[in-house]
């Protein structure tokens, strides 16, 4: 019996991080898939951010609330009855309400703009299940996005030109014009 219990404990310590990591990596991959559509650099996972996300997800799941925390990061929250990775699609779907011609913050598109925020380099993610079976998801981003006055250069349209490339394109046009 002791051998089986020790073996089960060993398996738990080996498999639990892998299962948890799969969720984190799936959310990261979804973010980066959407960011690529907007020529926005990939995010990387930050273990400290993820740890804080997991703790906060437990807190809001216990309260059944979606109250934002306060910190030096951007934050997206979501609650689902099933597949928590679908939160990323839900946040991205806010794009339909975002006006790229008048880039600014809106509470209707804040999740979308944060997940695509070009200057954000790292993210963390965590989840927790409430007593009612709902799954609460917390994603945090560093540096924080949704900075007033910085939307145009940080939230690019689909297939958007990278800001550093736009200068090269402009330079090529000038050269072509001068040497015509």
How would you describe each model-predicted region?
Residues 81-180:
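Disulfide-stabilized extracellular recognition modules
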Residues 4-20, 168-179:
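Cleavable N-terminal signal peptides of Sec/SRP-targeted secreted and luminal proteins
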Residues 19-73:
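Short, well-ordered surface patches within globular domains
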Residues 18-22, 80, 107:
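Conserved, non-catalytic sequence blocks in retroelement Pol enzymes and Pol-derived host proteins
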Residues 66-80, 84-88:
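A solvent-exposed, acidic/Ser-Thr-rich amphipathic alpha-helical stretch
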């Amino acid at each position: 019996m002791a051998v089986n219990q020790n073996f089960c404990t060993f398996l738990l310590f080996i498999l639990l991080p892998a299962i948890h990591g799969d969720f984190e990596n799936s959310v990261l991959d979804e973010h980066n898939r959407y960011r690529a559509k907007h020529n926005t650099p990939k995010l990387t996972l930050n273990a400290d951010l993820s740890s804080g996300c997991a703790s906060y997800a437990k807190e809001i799941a216990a309260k059944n609330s979606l109250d934002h925390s306060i910190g030096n990061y951007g934050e997206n929250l979501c609650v689902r009855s099933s597949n928590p990775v679908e939160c990323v699609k839900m946040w991205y779907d806010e794009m339909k309400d975002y006006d790229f011609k008048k880039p600014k913050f809106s509470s209707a598109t804040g999740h979308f703009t944060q997940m695509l925020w070009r200057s954000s380099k790292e993210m963390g993610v965590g989840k927790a299940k409430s007593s009612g079976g709902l799954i609460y998801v917390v994603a945090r981003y560093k540096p924080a996005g949704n900075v007033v006055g910085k939307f145009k250069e940080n939230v690019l349209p689909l297939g958007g030109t990278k800001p550093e490339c736009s200068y090269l394109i402009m330079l090529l046009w000038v050269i072509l014009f001068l040497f015509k």
